[in-house]
UniProtKB/Swiss-Prot annotation:
Its main location: endoplasmic reticulum. The gene is SSM4. Belongs to the DOA10/MARCH6 family. Keywords: Acetylation, Endoplasmic reticulum, Membrane, Metal-binding, Nucleus, Transferase, Transmembrane, Transmembrane helix, Ubl conjugation pathway, Zinc, Zinc-finger. This is ERAD-associated E3 ubiquitin-protein ligase DOA10. It is found in: Endoplasmic reticulum membrane; Nucleus inner membrane. It comes from the Eukaryota.
Amino acid sequence: MDVDSDVNVSRLRDELHKVANEETDTATFNDDAPSGATCRICRGEATEDNPLFHPCKCRGSIKYMHESCLLEWVASKNIDISKPGADVKCDICHYPIQFKTIYAENMPEKIPFSLLLSKSILTFFEKARLALTIGLAAVLYIIGVPLVWNMFGKLYTMMLDGSSPYPGDFLKSLIYGYDQSATPELTTRAIFYQLLQNHSFTSLQFIMIVILHIALYFQYDMIVREDVFSKMVFHKIGPRLSPKDLKSRLKERFPMMDDRMVEYLAREMRAHDENRQEQGHDRLNMPAAAADNNNNVINPRNDNVPPQDPNDHRNFENLRHVDELDHDEATEEHENNDSDNSLPSGDDSSRILPGSSSDNEEDEEAEGQQQQQQPEEEADYRDHIEPNPIDMWANRRAQNEFDDLIAAQQNAINRPNAPVFIPPPAQNRAGNVDQDEQDFGAAVGVPPAQANPDDQGQGPLVINLKLKLLNVIAYFIIAVVFTAIYLAISYLFPTFIGFGLLKIYFGIFKVILRGLCHLYYLSGAHIAYNGLTKLVPKVDVAMSWISDHLIHDIIYLYNGYTENTMKHSIFIRALPALTTYLTSVSIVCASSNLVSRGYGRENGMSNPTRRLIFQILFALKCTFKVFTLFFIELAGFPILAGVMLDFSLFCPILASNSRMLWVPSICAIWPPFSLFVYWTIGTLYMYWFAKYIGMIRKNIIRPGVLFFIRSPEDPNIKILHDSLIHPMSIQLSRLCLSMFIYAIFIVLGFGFHTRIFFPFMLKSNLLSVPEAYKPTSIISWKFNTILLTLYFTKRILESSSYVKPLLERYWKTIFKLCSRKLRLSSFILGKDTPTERGHIVYRNLFYKYIAAKNAEWSNQELFTKPKTLEQAEELFGQVRDVHAYFVPDGVLMRVPSSDIVSRNYVQTMFVPVTKDDKLLKPLDLERIKERNKRAAGEFGYLDEQNTEYDQYYIVYVPPDFRLRYMTLLGLVWLFASILMLGVTFISQALINFVCSFGFLPVVKLLLGERNKVYVAWKELSDISYSYLNIYYVCVGSVCLSKIAKDILHFTEGQNTLDEHAVDENEVEEVEHDIPERDINNAPVNNINNVEEGQGIFMAIFNSIFDSMLVKYNLMVFIAIMIAVIRTMVSWVVLTDGILACYNYLTIRVFGNSSYTIGNSKWFKYDESLLFVVWIISSMVNFGTGYKSLKLFFRNRNTSKLNFLKTMALELFKQGFLHMVIYVLPIIILSLVFLRDVSTKQIIDISHGSRSFTLSLNESFPTWTRMQDIYFGLLIALESFTFFFQATVLFIQWFKSTVQNVKDEVYTKGRALENLPDES
């Protein structure tokens, strides 16, 4: 808040208190404030001079507030309550705060007419000026700027081409550009539609460019602020001071120091720096404990580090306490010692001996002139390079001073009635104020006048944009100039440069291609290819397909660019600029490596200018790298997943198996929208897949099985950090691997059923929608109906508290069954079953496949005394009564015990061990280190990983583990397919059965067999037996969600019986020492009783309607309904009312009329009037939508009944009531009029209204009395409506004007008052 606003607030508060004190009844307003009540702003109680008020609907401890506190809060929001009509709302209850206006004693009872008239005229002109300014600003900035952008783009394109699309017609070329359509006409409607298309395209382009710039800026800002970035810079260019420079700098700062001491200091600082670097390198290496004892890697630690000499450590600590080698040293001496302000001008020195105590150290000071000679660039970038020893000293001194300052300030605050602590003004050796000390003072709250006396009165930087007519035009001109310059920089120049680059690249590519062609023929490879095609004809077919589809398209684009025949293509137009940008990025990346070549941690770069250039280039390189990775992961992945879902699921179901994709066909009206559709589909799939993985991870499988899929709770997840330090190739390979896994799940999981199994193997259409119900456009009713049905079905299923526990029960059973059959219970579930630790060997095939149970019962010690395979074969020959033996196999293995283990720790896992946890084979740590070093890249040692959860379990792993694991994944896919297909077909069969045998007979009985509704429903029911019906599936799944309750209770009962049943043959399962999970969503205890009390439909209704999205959609629907009704009413009133009356009067008076609708002349020739009517109607509809939006935000948090009541009342007032008042009388008059007119006289009804058409019918020789009466009543009705509205508006205007004049001329002030209690 600036000084002027403080003065205004104080003056306003004093005036209001003065006015309030003059009122005799002010004190009575606060009699209801209870004792102990406090102000919610200052927490103070009420006094006689400063009472408490409750001016809003807040209750409880936040009910009351002081008037002075409220005025300060209002002033902080830049609201002037002294202005007429100023309104302040509470931030908590959003209710207007109650103020009482106090008028002057000499205010007359009636406002003088002259004053009222003058104020009204001034107010009218002021509002007209404001409306004109706002309208002009809206037109220029919202409409004009995008069109200017579009026209400059076309102008630059014509400059690059050297010709215009329509030679000789610059205006047409500027409006239409390079369009594929036929030669357009310069008519008003055609130009308007073209400008509308240009505006929509440019707006999308502008939004994407803004998003791109914001993303790049914030990523750049985050990167340079990341801690690891400064370490990466240090790794590339090292410290600014080499050992030689460090010695020379120490010698310059301490000229009295001998060479031996300088050598010692430089060596100690260098040793400490190397020690820090070695600690960083050790992060890549494996724990040293694993090298000493390969059997203990649970708690890794480094035991091989040699002990350090305590004297060396103490020497270096003494070194750290040496006074700073910069100007902060003088400030420290002045603050801590309270010595005189005189500073020595000569060269002072003190000798520091190794091992001396820090208490005996003497401060060293350097000359002020030497410090002034220090380069400014060196000071600017000191904080960016952490390991530099001198910078480390400076940072430590600055931190100590800051801590001392904070402590002193805190002590001063804690002492009662203590003066505010103000740091003394620090001066350097040259006598200048130290800016760092000023920053410290400002950081702890020192007033600006004390921190820097020269900066008094300077407030925050605010862009002062005043809304004036000339300013609007000036800002628009600035925007036009900026648009021209920006497009020239971002489009014109890069495209021009790209032309030359593409010529170079195409030339190089041609040379390489010709060389490859010559090599192909000279090496005789064409002979081998011809022989291969004769042996395998499919090779020739595949190469022909590649040539026709891929190579042909590439050649087509190449010819279109080189011959300039594809001027309308956006890709061809963007190719040169894109080439320039990619080349620039490559140059930046290469330049950063070139500038830093020859430098490193051992050999630092000392040139500050070169360091600055490298830091800029390196920051840009990192920004491009991170942006590419983020774009691939956030946009590329979802879009690619959406394309694969379209190929494997949506296209076969909603289109045809003969087609590849379906989404581009429904987005034909605007092809770029298909990318958004793909992104939405892919994002939703990835979200649901992540939820499925989370459910399995949390409730079913053992912790640590999915360690390769990072958990959201993983402390090692540092996205920006990992994106910076890991090589681009490694990260791209990980992304490709993730996308490959998604592709397997999508293409094989869905595409096998929709494109192979059902259409080809089963020859069935059960996974295909009937042709009549396939959506063809994204705006068609079929598509939107399917979309809404799927959305509400999802909401209903999620609202059921039985579906999720039932799904968890299903997958627990599946995983338990599959793991037991594959002997993976120990590895997957964490339950060690002894019977799975081997296999049973039978005497022969008869006992193995026919009499397996008898063979197992023949050995009473089958599992208690296992045998080897040789022992079993020997016993089969010796013991004839035993037909089966248990032979153990497999190994025990170390596996991660958590999903959030560190990456380096995982490298030591999955090794076989004995029962005593002894390694069967020593770890090859050197190979692991080398592999980690290759994978980590140049900055891998900077990767700091959390090792808190680095522990392991010992589990049993059977033979052929990989095959069994892949089989488990296949079984999971099989049972997921059974679940999805089973629910789909059961749901459709259920609803089809109910409709065929329940609803259809009733409809046939009520409506008859030939009724259209019955026939259509009967055809749909017949088709549903052989085709997929999405509506039946959705309704049936909702019904099954109700049945899920009974299924869940039945399975719980079965589980209870199974738990009490005793199986003599079952061997007890031994669970690992694994912590118990938190069982969320327990099936019995977590069941929502709302469904049992109110019924499932009320629960579903409550869950759906409580959604903010549903409320928003309801608001949009009501706004559209109101807009449609208001448009229809306006059209009827205009045509059947106003223009009909106008035509009747002009025909009766002048014998003809200016406007005709019956012959469609008004539509053909009077386009300007139609445009004006459309603009007025659009403004009215916009106002209606804005009112509905305000109503939605005002009531979005209310209950559903109040929200429905409010929106329905708004629809009634704005829609139906308006229609009844204005349209119903006209319709009644029209019906009465038509009773007296023969059918032959009613012509051209399709082009206009009946009454208006009949009024212009030339077949009427004379006007009948009924016609005169009709038009007379119509004129009377319209006149009455007009004068009634004018009267209402005049009364409202008069009351508002009188009140505004009172508030502006006679207002003495406004005082706070209590909110009246609701009775």
